[in-house]
Amino acid sequence: MLGAFEGSNMIAQEVTVRIADTNWESIKLARMDNIPTYYGNPMSEHAGRTVDLSLYGTVLVISPYKQLNPLVTYHFEHELGKGAALGLSVNDSQKRASHQVSESYASKLCLFNEDMTYAKLAGYTSKGGKIKTTRLSDEFSYEDYEIEYQQRSIVLCAIEPNGKVRMFTSLKNIQPKSDWRIISLITENKKTDYIVFDKNSLNPST
């Protein structure tokens, strides 16, 4: 996973991951939570020698580093295979003609849902969002789950009984079944509007 912030650290507490970032403060927070990390450029030769990619099937590009994200995406798709690197949507300003991303790259920006940007995700966690794992059952189906949490959650991934992790994206229609676990970012409020940070306030280290 490229990008360490409160939300990614919470995801890592539920799913086996390694977080990579060039921001030492973010890496330090992840290490305090005993999450495996890589401090530095994940595309570097050093990363290639020290990180065993065979342990990971998917790379999630969850970072504000807009110039680095496409490079990371294509690098790991080359290493792991087509569709193995997923990123967040771009913001409205990037959709102008002068900032238009390529159709090929845009097709990979589908993580969680079609309009989930880094700023929205970070804003959601700043409003008290917490990671919650819910096990489905015959008595509490995914339809029941959506009714209960839809207005105050972002569904992140589902874990099958055999341990397989399936990420929610705008391109795949996952139909979770009984005994699956759903991992979501949920707020206490019954309905939560996104807080959107100004990109300058995120102040990532590059």
Give the location of each predicted region.
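Cytosolic regulatory regions of ion transport systems
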Residues: 1-206
